[in-house]
Structure formats: structure tokens, C-alpha cells
Amino acid sequence: MHNRYIFATSALLVLAGTLRWSHALAEASAENVAELEEIVITAQKRTEKLQDVPVSAMVVSAQALANANVADLSDLNNLVPSVQLNGTINGRVPTGIRGISSVSNEQTVGISSGVAINIDGVPVPSDSFAANNVAGIQNIEVLLGPQSTLGGRTAASGLINLTTRGPSDTLQGFATTTLTRDDEHRFEIFLSGPLSDRVEGSLSAYKSTTRYPITNLATGDKTTQDVAGGRGKLLFKVTDDLDVTLMAHSELTQGHGFNFVYSYITPGHDLLFTAPPAFEPPFLTPAILLPGITPSSNNLDYASPVTSAGASHRDADFSLTIEDRLGGGYTLASTTAFQQEKQAQTQDLFAVDNFFWNSLTGNNVHIPGHPLAPFFNTQSQVSTVKQLSEELKLVSPTDLPFSWLAGAFYSDTNVDETYIRSLPPAGLDVHVVPDTKTYDLYARSTWKFAPATSLVTGLRFNHDAISYTYDERTNVVRFGVPGLPDIIEGPFFSSGSSSGNTVVGDVGLKQQFADNVMGYVTYSRGYSPAAYNTSAVLYSNAALDPVGKESIDSVEIGTKGTYFNRTLTFNADIFDTRYTDYQIQSYANAPGVITPPLDLSSVGKAETRGAELSTEWLATSTTRLNLSAAYIDAKFVDYMGAPCYGLQTAAQGCVTPANGSPSQDVSGDTMPNSPKFKATLGVEQRIPLGSHPYELVFGGTYSYRTSAQMLPDQNPFAIQSGFGLLNLSAALQSSDGKYSARFFVNNVTNRHYFTDVEDFWSGPWNGNALIGQPARDSVRYAGLKLTASF
């Protein structure tokens, strides 16, 4: 292990030195007429050049987002190899970096996935859907690996910062529209400019309809998502040194239909077939419940009589930023932000083409005084997510021998959720309100103690206070048929609170080998805070015990360089990150359990290690290539007591203690949804049309990933084979880039794949039942994008 990393470190340093000399020779022998653009990032609390920051990071520009036809945040999967986003139209977007993610389902509230997501530096609540849409985004910055020192409590495995377009001192803007053959359409407009001598403004508006390749065979409808919103900013230049920026954002996202389809059901198994033989009619068989559907990894269909399935998310966000340039290059800045999202969601509980419970009981279910019967296959969730945050920071100039920044951060995140499952055999009516407060102090410094050597250190003190109230108004098992007695639990009420302090930090050494070539080594200490499993089912009024916090130790060694007269960038790193008391969510599947509980547990240890690289080459003034790749080995080091998958036998490792649930030991097994290798290759070729003020632009990207186990229980039917996605485009645009018409084809080879797989319906099928979520681009589609700017 250690020898492997010594060798890798030496290889990186030798490579950096070799490229340094190549860089010098190229400068001495050639003069290029084109250079790569300088990329800056703001995710570390100040504006910095990407190539100067001693951390593994990638930036996806607005142009790259447009060229890749990125529709939502989950499309980062195909652009940043170390990122894995499940994507969903019905709730939160579980996010992982380097194979690490804690959240598996949007039902759980108040818990972070381990990846901090910010918009213009303001943290987005983990339960919010607000960051899923990328309309109005200038670029996306991705910091890989633990970022707890500056990212805070939610950045255990990384940080994603979306920067939005803002005001300008000249009038500018653009309008763009996208149409596809499968009836997707998008429209976006942006305007920016001066309103007076000391006031500048910007306004963006967008609207889209996306039809996913998922069909409800019972109705013929496609799963669809509609988005409409806008963002406005006002910049007041109060004095030459004092700026005040106001931001308001509103968005409505509405999803229609279901986003999962069956990928596997154990042959010969029927829904609820554990009921007495007299209640096993043929309409509980897959042939009747799933007409015309063959569960498989290529399935794109479901069948449901539920027409109300879908979700809506209404966002209203506001921020006030005050920036005071104090003189001498020092800046004092304050950002106050309020975010609110109202969510409503209705799901088809088992996604079958029959109101099976009503048919089973002859529509005669009657529960006196109870509003949950008869059952029409739905469960619903209504939530309001609110967050108030304040950040105050003081930043020194960067050109000092000792530069630094220091700040204080406060946030209060509250989620108010009502969850109703009206299935009489497992009815549930819950109102849960978790609240999370954090009080933080942080500092980061860079000491250039030698002409080419700097020491980078950081420290953060966090005080986390978590609390909840849990009102379980109904928890029943009611069959409504003769001979089957009702089982009634509750009502129950529980509440609790917990708080704790944590100190995290990092220390690193940065070595400048040449003006444009540097190497670094960094040790980081991070954490994920304690949390309550508010998706648990109560069986008493006792307070829940919080799941303990997670601690993280990470080492990263890397190099960054710009070569050949700024026509080539090459960045590479290796990393090793250890997680102790790792937090993970999983469903406790067991035969006959209709609705398995979602468990949040703190397992022993987990680890991710590997290597990453990203490079871009401006081969000529009209030819550009880029390559990014990641090899990631993410696994459970110590995870005993993991849930078993459906029908897992003792010979396959599933054991059932005398007084416990079936469990297994998955120590040494892979993390869920973490391919060992991912890579993306992109190319762009511009062809000027002689004396005409236009040019042709041809582009393509190929993204490849190896096979991946999609579930922590290591279900053998949840392995997705490796695949590649090829996207091609051709455009006619003006030479100044102001006007363009681009034709594109995504997923040229028509390779179907899932972004998520779950097996929590194994219990009701009393076997092994899996559902998968097809990606938007899991079938080939073509489109046209028109853009005009000024």
C-alpha cells in the first residue's frame, strides 16, 4: 500500500518535471497565436485561478454545459468522472463524489449526502430540489474530496458550487431555445447591463418541458417534467469601495408520472402472495399487474392506473451580499440568505396496473373512523424546507507572503413534512419536523516561506445542534378481511435534541516547479455531523437516538500545470480517504415485509482511494481536445450487520440471529453506484468558411464507465454492466460566436442505462424485486439548439 503510493508520488513529480522542461523548450521554439482561457473558481471563499489551487477540482463552463446539452445537474455524471448523481424528477438528488454518498432515498429528511451543493457560495439545503436545474448557470465548480474546512458540515466527500450570471456595466444578453425529436423544449433569456451610474442589474428567465423515455402503458403517457423560473440581481455601487447585491430567485418544477420501472422480479413470485391461499387470486401475478412489461435492465415501461403520480417543487430564494473593500487589498463581505421550497409528491406505491387491495377485498374495505381506506395505490408527501444563513468573512490580498481569510457562518435549516401511506395493511400518517442549526468559525492561510514553496493550513470549529419532533398519528396493519385481525400501533409522539462540537482542518505543502507548474500534498480532517433517522417508524414515545458523527482522514497528492505557451493543461492527483463511523442508509428487506424500514446507521469503516486526471489541449487555434478520467476504489472496510437482499441464503452470507433481523457482512465489498473507472473524451473542431463571417463547429464527447454494484446490500441483480455514451453535434455559427444553430444527437449508440436501482419492493413480492430509474439520455435523441446574443 505505502510502496504503491510512494511510486505514484514519484511518478507524478517526475511527470511534472518532464513537462516543465517540455514547456521551456516549447516556449523557446514556437510562438502560438491561441491560448487556453484562464479559469477561475470561487468555491474556496475567494476568487482564485484553478491552476493555482492545491486541491483536485474541475470547472464546467457555460459553453461546455451548452455543448453537452446538459439538462440538469445529474448530467455531470458524463462530464466529471469522479461525480455520481442519481438524478430524480420527484425529490432530492442523491450525490456522490469518489464513491461516497450517505443518502439513498428522498424520504429521509434533514440528512446530508456528504456533498455540499452551493449556489453562488450559499449552501443549498440537502432536502431541496433547487440546485437540480442548471438554467441561468455561468459555470459549475466541483471540488473533489473532503472540503470540511471551508465547505462545512455537508462537504464530507466534496463540494459543488454553481455560479450564476450577474450584472454587468455594459448592455449584453442572449436568448436560446432547444427543440428535440422526443418533444423536449427549452427556452432561456438573459439580460444584463447598467440601470444608472451606480446601479447594474441582470434578469434571467427560463421555461422547459422534458419528456423522459419512460412510458405508462396503462395511459400511454410519458413521464414529464416542466420547469419555469427566473432570477434577478441588482448591484448597487454605493461607493467606489462598497457594493451591495440583491438576488431573488423563483422556480416551479412539476413532475408528472413515475420515474422507476421494474428491472427484475423473481420468476414465479406474485405480489402479496404470503396472504392466505383464499386471497391469492390471479390478478396478483406479474402477468396481470405488469401487462406488456418484461422486467429487465432494458425496460422503459411501467403500468399504473394512478394518474396523480408526480411531484412539484416551488422555490423562493433571496440573498443580500455586502462587499466592502477596506483598502490595501483587504475585503470584508457579508452574505445573508433565505431559501424556501414547498414540495408535494404523490407516488404509486408498487407501480402495478390494478388497485390490487380494493380488488382483493371486493372494494368492501371499511375501517370505522379511519380515512385511509379504500386504497388507491398511492402514498403522498408534503414538505416545506426553509433555511436562513449568514456568512461574514474577511479576506486578505493574495500577493502577500502570508495571505489568509477568516469567517463565521450560521445556518438554521428546518423541514416540516407530512407523509401519508394509505395502504390498509401498512397504513402510516406521520408529521415530522427536523431542525438543524450550525455555528461555525473558520480560517485558511497560505504562508510562502520560500520563493517557490508555500504552507497551506486551515481550521474550522463547528457547533451543530439538531432536534426533531415526530408525530406518528397512525401506524396500522389493517387487513379488512374476515379472519385477519387488525394490528394497531400508536399513535406515538417523540422528540429529541442533541448538540456537539467538532474541530476539523487541513495542512498542505505547495511547491511551484515553474511559473505554470506546481505540485502539492494535503492532509485533511473532515466530518459528517450526527443525525436523527426521522424515516424510522415509532413503536413507543421514546426519544430516538442520534446516529453518531462520521470522522474523515484524507491524503491527496497532485500536480497542476499549463504547458506549451498555454495550449495544454494537465492536472493529476492520487488520494486515499478513510471514513470512520461511516453513515449509510439502507432498506431492511425481509420476506413478507410490505414496507421495509429505511435504516440510517453508522457502520465501522469505509475507504476510497484512487487517481484522477484532467487535461485540455488547444492543438491548433481551431482544434480543442479534453480528457478527464478517474480510477476509484471505494469499499466498505468494516460493515457487519448490513441488510440482506431478497431471497439471500445463509450460503450466500445472510444470517438471522435469534432476536434480530436478517443481516450480512459486506466488509471488503464495493460502495454502491461507484464504477471503478470513468473517463470522458471531448473534441471540438472549428472550420472557418473562407471570407464569410461564419464557421462550422463539429463536436463530440464519449463517456465511459465500468460496471457498478448499485446497492449496498450487494444484490447480484443490481449490477449494471459497463457502457459508453457517444454525443455528437454540428453547428453553424457566426465567427464572433453571437449567433449559432447547433444540431446534436445524444446517446448515438442508443445505450440504455439506469441512474439508480432500488430493491425495497422485495418484501411485498416475497422475493427479489428491483426497480431502476432510466436516465433522460438512456435512449438516443436528436435536437436543434438556436442561440442569439449581443
Give short role names for the model-derived ranges.
Residues 112-114, 126, 135-144, 148-216, ...:
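Outer-membrane beta-barrel translocator/receptor signature
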Residues 161, 168-170, 178, 190-291, ...:
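Periplasmic-side early beta-strands and strand-to-turn transitions of outer-membrane beta-barrels
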Residues 319-349, 512-530, 546-618, 624, ...:
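Membrane-embedded beta-barrel scaffold of Gram-negative outer-membrane proteins
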Residues 34-170, 557:
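Acidic, small-polar-rich N-terminal luminal/periplasmic segments of exported/outer-membrane proteins
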